[in-house]
Amino acid sequence: MFIIKSMLYRLMQMIVVLFVISTLTFILMKLSPGNPVDKILHLDVAQVSTEQINATKDKLGLNDSLLVQWWHWMNHLLHFNLGKSFESKEPVTQILFNYAPITLLISFSTLVVSLCISIPLGIIAAKRFHKWTDKVIRVISTLSISLPAFFIGIILLFIVTNLMNIDSVILSQFILPVITLSLGMCAYIIRLVRSNLLMLLQSNIVQASRLRGMNERYILIHDLLKPTILPIIPLLGISLGSLIGGTVVIENLFDIPGIGYLLMDSIKSRDYPVIQGCVLFIGFFVVIINTIADLLTLLLDPKQRLQLGNPKIKTNTPLISVSSDRHA
């Protein structure tokens, strides 16, 4: 019962945030410079008649009050009607459907690659604490966090195209962007896995398993893997959302026809309906992914369920008794 209430509460939070994002997008577009009528007519205002201008404004509803315009905007949004592009005259929804798959493919591929690399490296770093393997992994992680993604992308692009003379669309528009985005994400997950595992290795349950004669592999799989990976889920929600925003730079760097590329191209041409659609897509995706991550954490983490059943229990109360000697 407590879980259902908490899930409903998080879903209500998501609806409120989506409403705020939609309203802010409407306000920002109204405050943006330029006149959409000029863009639609593709002519200077001085070269068209007043009747044409007024007819276009009536068609767009620009003569209505801001409150009425906002109401029409929200009503159209609920019906997935984002208007038509000023440039191509195509529905914005259709344009987003054409550009979104490559962005989602790169983002989820980055997520899978990051998990496959970072979880084993985090475990190795924790098991070889303060040895040369741990130090090398920590140095690489620090460098990956410190260097901006676009700088790493430029270096990879230079190495592949100039030094290795490789001309491949799959390499330049898929593999290299995934590697570029994965490096920074891997660094955060490695640090989280390493710190969680170091703490859990000192827990009483691990000491008891060792006293029973269990080998280290059994302890890792049965006692440590789940509590080590569970804290990654909220981080993945945040990281996946930031990946969508990060693709704006990466897609333009590698010339990938995704949402980020579409957004920058629309900003240059002042195609306001498409800009609105891109901003809403990114905002909605981030909110929905984080909500799903919260719900998964709630369903899989016993600590969260215990805290919901008894609010007096603090969320930071460990379910595994940990000794006071913790490794940094």
UniProtKB/Swiss-Prot annotation:
<dbReference type="InterPro" id="IPR045621">
    <property type="entry name" value="BPD_transp_1_N"/>
</dbReference>
<keyword id="KW-0921">Nickel transport</keyword>
<feature type="transmembrane region" description="Helical">
    <location>
        <begin position="104"/>
        <end position="124"/>
    </location>
</feature>
<dbReference type="Pfam" id="PF00528">
    <property type="entry name" value="BPD_transp_1"/>
</dbReference>
<feature type="transmembrane region" description="Helical">
    <location>
        <begin position="229"/>
        <end position="249"/>
    </location>
</feature>
<keyword id="KW-0406">Ion transport</keyword>
<comment type="function">
    <text>Part of the ABC transporter complex NikABCDE (Opp2) involved in nickel import. Probably responsible for the translocation of the substrate across the membrane.</text>
</comment>
<protein>
    <recommendedName>
        <fullName>Nickel import system permease protein NikB</fullName>
    </recommendedName>
</protein>
<comment type="similarity">
    <text>Belongs to the binding-protein-dependent transport system permease family. OppBC subfamily.</text>
</comment>
<keyword id="KW-0812">Transmembrane</keyword>
<keyword id="KW-0472">Membrane</keyword>
<dbReference type="InterPro" id="IPR000515">
    <property type="entry name" value="MetI-like"/>
</dbReference>
<keyword id="KW-0533">Nickel</keyword>
<feature type="transmembrane region" description="Helical">
    <location>
        <begin position="11"/>
        <end position="31"/>
    </location>
</feature>
<feature type="transmembrane region" description="Helical">
    <location>
        <begin position="170"/>
        <end position="190"/>
    </location>
</feature>
<feature type="transmembrane region" description="Helical">
    <location>
        <begin position="279"/>
        <end position="299"/>
    </location>
</feature>
<feature type="domain" description="ABC transmembrane type-1">
    <location>
        <begin position="100"/>
        <end position="297"/>
    </location>
</feature>
<keyword id="KW-1133">Transmembrane helix</keyword>
<feature type="transmembrane region" description="Helical">
    <location>
        <begin position="139"/>
        <end position="159"/>
    </location>
</feature>
<keyword id="KW-0813">Transport</keyword>
<dbReference type="GO" id="GO:0005886">
    <property type="term" value="C:plasma membrane"/>
</dbReference>
<dbReference type="InterPro" id="IPR050045">
    <property type="entry name" value="Opp2B"/>
</dbReference>
<dbReference type="Pfam" id="PF19300">
    <property type="entry name" value="BPD_transp_1_N"/>
</dbReference>
<keyword id="KW-1003">Cell membrane</keyword>
<comment type="subunit">
    <text>The complex is composed of two ATP-binding proteins (NikD and NikE), two transmembrane proteins (NikB and NikC) and a solute-binding protein (NikA).</text>
</comment>
<dbReference type="InterPro" id="IPR035906">
    <property type="entry name" value="MetI-like_sf"/>
</dbReference>
<dbReference type="GO" id="GO:0015099">
    <property type="term" value="F:nickel cation transmembrane transporter activity"/>
</dbReference>
